[in-house]
Every structure is written in C-alpha cells, then in structure tokens.
Amino acid sequence: MIAPDGTEHFCSRKIHCARCSTRKRSDGGTEYFHAFLGASIVAPGHKQVLPLPREFIAPQDGAAKQDCECNAAKRWLAKHGASVVHLRPVYLGDDLFSHQPLVEAIQRANGSCILTCKPASHKIISEYLYGATLEEHRETTITRGKRTTTVYRWLSGVPLRDGRDALHVSWLSMEILNGKGKRTYYNSFVTDLAVSADTVAELAACDRTRWKSRMRRSMC
C-alpha cells in the first residue's frame, strides 16, 4: 500500500520566494510556505515504512490557481505510478483525495484505492446512503477483561459525484464500541476494491495504516 500525504516544511510572513505558496490569515496578513506531497509504502502490522520520491507543492507554469495537494498527487501518479505498478498498489488517502478526478488518476496508473470519506464533504454520497440498507459485520473481542465491538457497514455501487459519468465505488464505515456501547472511534471510506464480510475488516485496517506514514514524517 502507498500512502501519500501533504506536509509543510517552511512558513514565514517575511521570508518568501517565487516557489512559495500563500494563504491569508484572519488578521489580514499573508503567510508564505513550502509544502510537499510525501509518499510511503506501508502495511498493516508493520512498524516500518518505506519512503518514496516526493512531489513539491509549488506554483506551476501557466496555472491560474495556486497548486494544491490533489494536483501534486496527480503529478506524482503520472511520474512514479508506472515504477510501482508491479506492486499492484493500493493507494491510501485522506478526505481530500476521495473525489472522482483523483480516483480516476489512480486507476489510470493501474492502482486501486481506499480513501477516507467524510459525510460532510460528500453530499451526493450522503444522500445516496440515506435510507439505504447497509450490509453489516460485527467482531467482538475481550482483552484484559474489557469488551470491544467493532461494527463494519458497507454499500456497493455508490456514485462519487452527480451525473451520468460518475464512478461507482463501495462505501464502508468502521465503528468501535466499548463494553458500555459507547462509541470510541468512527470513520468512513470509499474504495474501488470488492467489499464483503470476509474483506471489510482488512480494508478498514489498511486505511488506518496510513497514519504511520504521517507520524514518521512528523518526527523527522
């Protein structure tokens, strides 16, 4: 699995260059910063991550809009996707990535994806799920006398956006409940991989693995 994620490595209100990105602050000031898209090979159950080439997020020639993490991800796939295709990569990503243009870029690079999908930023998906009958799978474990129940729910054939050209993916969620039935964790995802009672737990675990990559970069 390959986990790309954006990271800043410089920020200033005074020092800047032509390669800086900018943002306005609430006090009217301008911040100048450098950022890049890092990518690492990760795997559930393994502490180690293997870093891959990075792609800088910086002004692009001829572009009217400021560069962003998603555009950097598309460039990374175009440059490096072919070199990792033999790994049959599954790309992991946060909510910024779970939109059709980037999923299409991943598929053009002969990859698959498992991407975080927040309901608040995906209106079409939320509307499609409303009232739908979801598949469900539960797993209960007892560790040191404490009961934990993990509830997985999923639905296949969900459109990523409105329109006839919409890609259809599978939506899944993972909810962890303690012994009193209180929710201690929840997240939802979209994937172009097949989801079933046999695979849903593994798919959800794969997406959570990308946090290793983020933590490794934060310690560098």
Regions found by a protein language model. Name each.
Residues 92-100, 119-121:
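Acidic, metal-coordinating catalytic cores used for nucleic-acid/nucleotide bond scission
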Residues 115-210:
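An anionic, glycine-rich sequence signature occurring as long contiguous blocks
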Residues 68-90:
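Short, basic/hydrophobic alpha-helical segments
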Residues 1-46:
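Active-site-proximal, Lys/Arg-enriched surface segment
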Residues 34, 49, 86-88, 110:
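A general structural motif
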Residues 103-112, 130-131:
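Short, surface-exposed basic-aromatic patches at helix termini and helix-loop junctions that form
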